[in-house]
Amino acid sequence: MTRPDLNERILSLRKLRLAQCRTRTRRTIERRNGVRLEINGSWLVEFCSNDYLGLAQHFEIIAALQDAAARNGIGATASHLICGHHAIHKALEYELAEWLGYPRALLFGSGFTANLAVQQALLTKENDICVQDRLNHASLIDATRLAGCRLRRYPHLDVDGAAHQLKNAPEGAAMLATDGIFSMDGDIAPLRALSLVARTQQALMYVDDAHGIGVTGPQGRGCIAAAWLSVEEVPLQLVTLSKALGGYGAAVLGSATLIQHLAETARPYIYTTALPPAQAAAALTAIRIARRDEWRRQRLQELVERFRENSRRHGLEIMDSETPIQPLQCGDETTTMAMSAALEREGFLVNAIRPPTVPEGKSRLRVTLSALHTTEQIDTLVQALARSRDTLATEAAPVQV
C-alpha cells in the first residue's frame, strides 16, 4: 500500500495558492495607539480591525482587567463545570441576558466554538437540517458539517429561498441560521421576514450577531433588537465579546431550557477551560460602557455616512452596506493585493480579502471603521483609494501605437 505523502500534498497546494495570489501573511503589531499601529518600525492607520466602538484600549476596561487578574489570577484553571466558573463569569452572563432581553446566557471562549457547540448539541440526528444563508460565517457552515446533520444553503438574503429549503425537508428537526451583519459584505439579514419563515416551518431561528452587538439597535443591543424581535421570534442568538466590545470570548443567549441543555451536552463547552476571569471582567465593563456611551454609535454612523458619500463622489465601487464594514469591490486577486500594497505605502492598513473567504471574482478591500477614526483619516483614505485605483487602471491600459 502506498499512501499519499502529506508533505508533497501541502507543497503542491502552496504552489497553487502562490499562482492564484492567495497566500496569507501574518503582520506583527509592535505597538498600538487607538487606530494607529506600528509595523516594522512604521506607523499605519488601520482600517481593518473590528474595534468598532474603540473600546479595546479604554482605560476603564484595562483597569477592570488588571484588577480581576490581581484577584483571580491569569486563568480560570478549569472548565466551567469543574471549578472554573467564577463569580465574574456569573455576573457577565447575567448582564448579557438582562441587556439583550433573554432569560439566560452561556459564555464561550470564541464565537467559532460557540457555533460548534450549538449545532452539535441541538442537531443530533442525521435527518435534522440546518438551513443557512450562503454567505454565513465559516463557523456556522463548519458547525453543521461537524454536527453530521443535513446542510442546505439559500441565496444571499433570499427569504423565499430559505422557505423553499425548509419546505423541501419536512422530516427531522430544523434550524434556520443566519449572520446578523455579514462579515465580508457588511449588509444586514432580513431578520423579521426570516423569523416568520422559521415560525411557519417550525424551525428554530438562530442568529449569529457577532458584528451587530454594540453597533446597532437600541443601547447597542444588536440586529435582533433593531428589527424589534425578541426571544419569542429568535430563541437563540450568539454575540461576541471581541469586536465592538474590544475583548475576547462569546456568549449564546436563549431560554433557560436551551441554555441548560447546552451547558450539559455541548462538548465544546464541557471539555475546555473557561474564559479567563480577567477577560470576563473586561467584557462586563465594556458592556456597561457600550450601553452608556450612545455617542460612540452616533459617531460611528456619522463616519460610515461620510465614508460612503466621499467614496461615491470619487466613483469608488463600494458595496451596499450601512454598517462599519465597507467593502470595496476590486475583482481579481492581483488588483486587490496591489491596491492594498499601494495604500500601505500611503500609511494605511487595509486588508485584501480573496477567495475562498469570498466567492471567485469577488476579491475586495474590506474597510472597517471605528468610532476612534477622525474625519481627516476618513477623507485621506478615500483619496488614497481613488489614487491607487487610477494608478492601477493607467498601468493596465493598453499602450497606444
Swiss-Prot record:
The keyword NAD does not apply. Pyridoxal 5'-phosphate binds at residues 111-112, 183, 211, 240. Pathway: Cofactor biosynthesis; biotin biosynthesis. It comes from the Bacteria. InterPro entries: Aminotrans_II_pyridoxalP_BS, Aminotransferase_I/II_large, AON_synthase_class-II, AONS_Archaea/Proteobacteria, AONS_Proteobacteria, PyrdxlP-dep_Trfase, PyrdxlP-dep_Trfase_major, PyrdxlP-dep_Trfase_small. The modification N6-(pyridoxal phosphate)lysine is found at residue 243. Substrate binds at residues 24, 137, 357. Its EC number is 2.3.1.47. GO terms for biological process: biotin biosynthetic process. Keywords: Biotin biosynthesis, Pyridoxal phosphate, Transferase. Its cofactor is pyridoxal 5'-phosphate. One of its GO terms (molecular function) is pyridoxal phosphate binding. It catalyses: 6-carboxyhexanoyl-[ACP] + L-alanine + H(+) = (8S)-8-amino-7-oxononanoate + holo-[ACP] + CO2. Belongs to the class-II pyridoxal-phosphate-dependent aminotransferase family. BioF subfamily. HAMAP family: BioF_aminotrans_2. Homodimer. Catalyzes the decarboxylative condensation of pimeloyl-[acyl-carrier protein] and L-alanine to produce 8-amino-7-oxononanoate (AON), [acyl-carrier protein], and carbon dioxide. This is 8-amino-7-oxononanoate synthase. It comes from Xylella fastidiosa (strain M12).
